[in-house]
Curated annotation (Swiss-Prot):
Designated name of the protein: Protein Smg homolog
Natural source organism: Alkalilimnicola ehrlichii (strain ATCC BAA-1101 / DSM 17681 / MLHE-1)
Family designation: Belongs to the Smg family.
Length: 157
């Protein structure tokens, strides 16, 4: 069965990252468990590389752009991220859930998934993981978590 990096990340997030009740096992234990769960060593390594890239983003300086700056997507990004996904990212930025640095990190992490098709659910999960990893984003994380799991928010265009 072909698994994706994204499925490994979802497994880790649901079972360990978002669970504050239990201490997190070490990386070797996680790799063994993921292998036993049916993920390939290559996918496991790529998922940990993805998480390392997310963790490394905490040390990157934020770039400042003007208030009226418009994000223009590169051709590779428009191929991978459909109009609905890009529109949702814009909505999150306009709603104050993502700032510019958060938006760029979400786009970076979506591109790092190496999946050809990035759908709206994938975008929502990646936004949730990015917000979870960013200090001071608890309220935005809770909002995204409600949106992802409860789906109470109706977007009006």
């Amino acid at each position: 069965m072909k698994q994706s990096i994204f499925e490994v990340l979802i497994y880790l997030f649901e079972n360990y990252l978002a669970n504050d009740d239990e201490p997190s096992p070490d990386r070797d234990s996680l790799e063994s468990e993921l292998f036993e769960a049916g993920f390939t060593p290559l996918e496991i390594r790529k998922a940990f590389d993805w998480l390392d890239g997310l963790a490394d983003s905490r040390n990157m300086p934020a770039t400042v752009t003007g208030d009226r700056a418009i994000r223009v997507y590169h051709e590779r990004e428009t191929v991978r991220l459909d109009v609905e996904s890009r529109g949702f990212i814009l909505f999150l930025e306009q709603a104050g859930i993502l700032d510019r640095a958060g938006r760029e990190l979400v786009i970076d992490r979506l591109m790092a998934l190496e999946d050809d098709d990035v759908d709206l659910d994938t975008v929502k999960w990646v936004v949730l993981m990015v917000l979870f990893n960013q200090p001071g984003q608890e309220e935005a994380f809770n909002w995204m978590e409600d949106l992802l799991f409860d789906n109470p928010v109706h977007l009006v265009h």
